[in-house]
Amino acid sequence: MSSSYWAVVPAAGVGKRMEADIPKQYLPLMGKTVIEHTLARLLQHPRIQAVVVAVSSEDRWWSERLFQDNERIIRVTGGAERCHSVRNGLESLMALAAPEDWVLVHDAARPCLRKEDIDRLIETLHDHPMGGLLALPISDTVKRADAEGSVMETVDRKGLWRAMTPQMFPLAKLYNSLREAIAAGVQVTDEASAMEWAGFSPRLIEGYSDNIKITHPQDLAQAEVFLKRQERGE
């Protein structure tokens, strides 16, 4: 019996670095909001059963969104931090999916995700014991700075990767690892870090560099460039 695939999108953040009046996932991008592009990329993939979206209890923008009546969208209440929102999303899936089903956790502010990246995750990890994540090898020179912003050292970039999403893991393993890490007070910055804390070694899978996370105002213009290139088949 083959496993099913589900997605969780934490979307309860406020995106303070965007210097905008609304959360970055609701900013306009080519006639839609950022999160509409993101959810569409996931919903268009034939292997994904449904998408759980974790939004803030004080979110006043979601109710106006195009996807509010989509039966493949499951809305849950997010938490104080990203890890809490993901945990809440996984908890809702535990009642719907099999423990061995796969879950792809994807940032709401990554609207340029390609189908090929999802395909690569599924094809590479479907028989992997603990899962993995999209990532990019670091090619730039990396500096470590002090509190004043002065360079302390140049970091050897050999073996360093920049983590991206989706990050794909077996549902029960991720849920238990994340829940226990949070309870232990571990700083969990992504799903892979929770799995690492639990003793697993996630697989790194090189993804497309245009799968950017919108963090700063200039990222919106860059995302539009990438989306238009993708529309042209580039």
From Swiss-Prot:
EC number per UniProt: 2.7.7.60
Site (Positions MEP for the nucleophilic attack): R157, K213
Coiled-coil intervals: none
PROSITE patterns: ISPD
GO function term, MF aspect, one: 2-C-methyl-D-erythritol 4-phosphate cytidylyltransferase activity
Biological process annotations from GO: isopentenyl diphosphate biosynthetic process, methylerythritol 4-phosphate pathway
Pathway assignment: Isoprenoid biosynthesis; isopentenyl diphosphate biosynthesis via DXP pathway; isopentenyl diphosphate from 1-deoxy-D-xylulose 5-phosphate: step 2/6
Site feature Transition state stabilizer, where: R17, K24
Alphabetized InterPro entries for the sequence: IspD, IspD/TarI, IspD/TarI_cytidylyltransf_bact, ISPD_synthase_CS, Nucleotide-diphossugar_trans
Class of the enzyme per the UniProt entry, highest EC level: transferase
Catalytic activity entry: 2-C-methyl-D-erythritol 4-phosphate + CTP + H(+) = 4-CDP-2-C-methyl-D-erythritol + diphosphate
Domain of life of the native organism: Bacteria
Keyword terms: Isoprene biosynthesis, Nucleotidyltransferase, Transferase
Described purpose of this protein according to its UniProt entry: Catalyzes the formation of 4-diphosphocytidyl-2-C-methyl-D-erythritol from CTP and 2-C-methyl-D-erythritol 4-phosphate (MEP).
Family: Belongs to the IspD/TarI cytidylyltransferase family. IspD subfamily.
PANTHER family listed in its UniProt record: 2-C-METHYL-D-ERYTHRITOL 4-PHOSPHATE CYTIDYLYLTRANSFERASE, CHLOROPLASTIC (PTHR32125:SF4)
Name of the protein described by the UniProt record: 2-C-methyl-D-erythritol 4-phosphate cytidylyltransferase
